[in-house]
A protein has these predicted regions:
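Single conserved hydrophobic/aromatic residue that forms the stacking wall/gate
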Residues: 112-113
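Active-site-adjacent loop/helix surface patches within enzyme catalytic domains
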Residues: 2-109
Length: 113
């Protein structure tokens, strides 16, 4: 079991009025030279959470911190004009809160960033 001491939350940096399937996210990462999705969890707008990389496999989401972190990504992050915005839906917020709580319970020495 690898030592996890950090949870990093990301967004897909896609417009909030567009959708991005887990498969499309995986393809985006592969086109950038990664071996699949770099995040461990992906939260869709409806609050559905997808395991996109096993937690025991080192992520590719936060250079310099991948070996000791878990990456969570939510769909969205840009407004309809492409500017950074908090586009999280109530469902995404609830799922994110629950997922982080579960991860922190499982790994008492982990911090959120």
């Amino acid at each position: 079991m690898r030592i996890i001491n950090l949870i990093v939350v990301h967004c897909t940096a896609t417009q909030g009025n567009r959708t991005l399937s887990p498969e499309a996210l995986d393809l985006m990462h592969r086109r950038r030279g990664f071996n699949g999705t770099g995040y461990h969890y992906y939260i869709r707008k409806d609050g559905t959470v997808h395991l996109t990389r096993p937690v025991e496999r080192i992520g590719a989401h936060a250079k310099g911190f991948n070996a000791s972190s878990i990456g969570i990504c939510y769909e969205g992050g840009l407004d309809c004009r492409g500017r950074p915005a908090d586009t999280r839906t109530p469902e995404q917020r609830a799922t994110l809160r629950l997922l982080i709580h579960q991860l922190l319970e499982d790994r008492k020495s982990t911090r959120l960033n």
